[in-house]
UniProtKB/Swiss-Prot annotation:
Pfam families: Glyco_hydro_79C. Its EC number is 3.2.1.31. Optimum pH is 6.0. This is Beta-glucuronidase. It is an enzyme of class 3 (hydrolase). It comes from Neurospora crassa (strain ATCC 24698 / 74-OR23-1A / CBS 708.71 / DSM 1257 / FGSC 987). It is found in: Secreted. Beta-glucuronidase that hydrolyzes beta-glucuronosyl and 4-O-methyl-beta-glucuronosyl residues of arabinogalactan-protein. Hydrolyzed heparan sulfate only very weakly. Has no activity on xylan from birchwood. Able to catalyze the transglycosylation of glucuronic acid (GlcA) residues from p-nitrophenyl-beta-glucuronic acid (PNP beta-GlcA) to various monosaccharide acceptors such as glucose, galactose and xylose. Glycans are attached at residues 53, 91, 99, 143, 203, 222, 280, 427, 440, 465, 491, 520. The lineage of its organism: Eukaryota, Fungi, Dikarya, Ascomycota, Pezizomycotina. The active site is at residues 194, 312. Keywords: Glycoprotein, Hydrolase, Secreted, Signal. Belongs to the glycosyl hydrolase 79 family. Residues 1-19 form the signal peptide. SUPFAM superfamilies: (Trans)glycosidases.
């Protein structure tokens, strides 16, 4: 086939050092993602920081959520949970939202002794037009009087705070597969097993339903009431999700979504690197595929098992690692991870974050450990949302056209490139190309001290050559079909600042997280347009080539 177009120019076209050929099938997958595919999980103890309260709502967080909502038509769903939901006890006389004590021997990142007061639930008023998942305490609630009393006291408060369409679902317990082995302190004996977990889960969720019927009857109805579960930490721990399902976890048929958690590796795990661990498509694929194997085992037990989501996930467990989880390379990992997950059947992904967490998409407040600001991973979230968003001609209120299906376009020659196609109403609407080859511009690759100009080498690039469906040939009237390219860019994969999406910045210091077009970044309308050309020798297919620099991504949109 004759490739008509070599590519789309970027500000300065680098020397092409490699090229890959990819064929794009016109047949769309049949498994669309849910609305608000890019969603969040906020650490329970950090929720007041992220959301604020009635007197002081966190408008920075609200702006960042609004950005995503304006792109996709639905704001991200917020799951409030994590390890600290299973430490939280209720104190009705507490004059503020949360009192937490950090024990460095257990965790230096979040409190492990926690009391919440009535005003904790004010935080659910801060984000407008947002749906929530609230986490109740099973860790202490299932085996301690104080924990059980907390459940009795907080269900009425939570349900009243989440009325009026705010509630999506509940959770009861976070990562119960680790209850007997947790590094932060076990809350169950070594004999803890799936049958005991299911017994305690059913006991607690039935009490929750009883309390809802008494206090918030509208939230006890079948159309509203439900859970995401089992929220296990992974597939390799002591408790196994298929066995828990077989023990009757969904006996009451109230689990809306099958939720699992995932981290590619650990913050202090030996051998973890940006290139080898995060910017590595093979690692991402293997990590996600293990969950598909597990989910298929659940489906074999129960063919009607609910849809699959990541209820909590991010790059490296234990809140991430500086120089890895907070870099632009982690943003590129997030794009690859989210879209590969979508391509194999995950319906929604909740990216986890907390105050001072290294992998967080943003830091909600200033602390003695971190400054308030938009972090690199958020830009990856924006890119994923832009890829999945309804095409411009499709109204947000039309489910048939607004929900995307995603196809993984395998590249077998290297683990450092990946590509995906998005379809709406069976029509190819976008491609995204991710160059995961690292390109560092700071000393030690930690994103802090820039290398001197004399130490910088030319930034490599790869040309993605596409064979497209015949529908992307010239039209009958001879009008060329135009594409627009939007780029996710930074100075290098180790950068922690200076990141842009299509020339836009979402930084706190510019306009509180609202999008600001940077004048020194080339605009799409000026230099990132191209046309799909006519093929000649392979059945009339069209060709397209796109150059993508190392440590960057490009979205191709058919217009």
């Amino acid at each position: 086939m004759k490739r008509i177009l070599g590519l789309i120019a970027y500000a300065s076209v680098p020397t092409v050092i490699n090229a890959v050929q990819i064929s794009v099938d016109e047949t769309a997958p049949s498994n669309p993602v849910f609305d608000a595919y890019v969603s969040y999980s906020i650490e329970f103890s950090s929720f007041p920081d992220y959301a604020g309260n009635n007197s002081r709502p966190n408008t920075f967080s609200e702006n960042l959520l609004d950005n995503l909502g304006k792109i996709t038509g639905t704001k991200p769903y917020i799951r409030v949970g994590g390890n600290t939901q299973d430490y939280a006890l209720y104190n009705a006389s507490l004059p503020y939202s949360l009192n937490g004590t950090i024990d460095p021997k257990r965790s230096s990142d979040y409190p492990t002794t926690i009391f919440i007061g009535p005003s904790f639930f004010e935080s659910y008023n801060s984000f407008k037009n947002t749906r929530f998942i609230h986490g109740f305490n099973l860790g202490l609630g299932g085996n301690r009087t104080s924990g059980w009393q907390t459940l009795l006291d907080t269900v009425p408060l939570a349900c009243k705070a989440l009325g009026g369409g705010k509630l999506f679902a509940w959770t009861y317990g976070n990562e119960p597969d680790l209850f007997s082995t947790s590094a932060q302190g076990p809350v169950r004996p070594p004999s803890w097993n799936e049958a005991e977990y299911v017994d305690q889960w059913l006991n607690g969720t039935r009490k929750i339903h009883e309390l809802l019927e008494r206090n918030c009857p509208d939230l006890a109805k079948n159309g509203t009431y439900g859970y995401i579960a089992p929220s296990f930490a992974g597939v390799g721990n002591k408790l196994k999700a298929p066995k828990a399902w077989g023990e009757g976890l969904n006996e009451d048929k109230n689990i809306k979504l099958f939720a699992t958690h995932n981290y590619i590796s650990g913050a202090t795990s030996p051998g973890v690197t940006l290139q080898g661990t995060l910017m590595n498509h093979s690692m991402t694929k293997a990590s996600v595929d293990a969950h598909i194997v597990e989910y298929n085992q659940v489906k074999a037990i129960d063919a009607a098992a609910p849809p699959l989501i990541f209820g909590e996930t991010n790059s490296l467990y234990n809140q991430g690692r500086p120089g890895l989880s907070n870099t632009f390379g982690a943003a590129l990992w997030g794009v690859d991870f989210n879209l590969y997950s979508a391509s194999v059947g995950f319906k929604r992904v909740h990216m986890h974050m907390g105050t001072n967490y290294r992998y967080a998409s943003w830091q909600p407040i200033a602390t003695n450990k971190a400054t308030i600001g938009t972090k690199a991973p958020y830009y990856g979230n924006i890119a994923v949302a832009s890829f999945l968003a309804p095409p411009p001609s499709s109204p947000y209120d039309s489910p048939a056209t607004s929900l995307a299906t995603v196809k993984h376009l395998p590249i077998s020659s290297t683990p450092f490139l990946s590509a995906y196609a998005a379809y709406h109403s069976s029509n190819l609407t976008r491609l995204i190309l991710i160059n995961l080859q690292s390109y560092n511009t700071t000393a030690s690759g930690e994103g802090l001290a820039p290398l001197p100009p004399s130490s910088l080498t030319p930034r490599p690039s790869v040309t993605f050559n596409f064979t497209l469906p015949a529908a992307y040939l010239l039209t009958d009237g001879g009008k060329e079909k135009q594409v627009v390219v939007k780029r996710l860019m930074a100075n290098g994969s180790d950068a922690i600042t200076g990141i842009t999406w299509d020339g836009w910045s979402y930084n706190w210091e510019l306009d509180g997280g609202r999008p600001v077009r940077l004048p020194n970044v080339t605009r799409t309308s000026e230099s990132e347009r191209a046309w799909v050309g006519e093929g000649t020798s392979d059945g009339g297919k069209a060709g397209l080539g796109v150059v993508v620099e190392a440590g960057s991504a490009a979205l191709v949109e058919f217009v």
